[in-house]
Amino acid sequence: MRITAISAAAALMVLSVSSSLMAQRPDDQIDPRSLALLQEGRTAKAAGNLDGAQDALESALAVDPRNREAFLVLADIARTRGLPGKAIRFYGEALALEPNDLGALRGQGEALVAKGATAKAKENLAKIKTACGGECNDATLLAASIAKGPPVTATAQVEPAKPAPAKP
């Protein structure tokens, strides 16, 4: 009797584990709804509708958070809006999914340069050179961005106060 109960429990466990594994998709298979939203976001971005593009891309990531391309387009939108910190985060999410994505490494490096973190950008350049076996287009573009340096930003300059004339 005891063996029958244990056997039944083991069979039930094997059945439930195997059926749950069959329902999962492989990592490289992105949900088609997410891909459709990605395309919608790209179209909106090309039309200049950055808010609509961002909404569609965020929806694509809600449907399937493994959509690396959606992170890359969101990072490009953030850079277009002058938000390099946000772009760095999106590129980091894409790199978490695929650490050797040359476009993400270059984009993150350029965003790091925009923030003034050239040392980190040089680390990305070294990773790109290692991944592509020397010089490649992404390495050349990032090296040029590093050589150019961070963009000059306008700051509010306050002229020193003139001393008040002395009263006799």
How would you name each of these model-derived features?
Residues 32-63:
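Alpha-helical segment of the N-proximal tetratricopeptide repeat
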Residues 63, 97, 130-134:
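Structural marker of alpha-solenoid helical repeat scaffolds
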Residues 45, 62, 75-79, 113:
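Position-specific recognition of the canonical hydrophobic site in helix A of tetratricopeptide repeat
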Residues 25-34, 123-168:
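Terminal, low-structured helical/coil segments at or just beyond the last alpha-helical repeat
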Residues 60, 93-94, 127-128:
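Canonical positions in the second alpha-helix
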Residues 73-74, 107, 141-145:
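Canonical tetratricopeptide repeat
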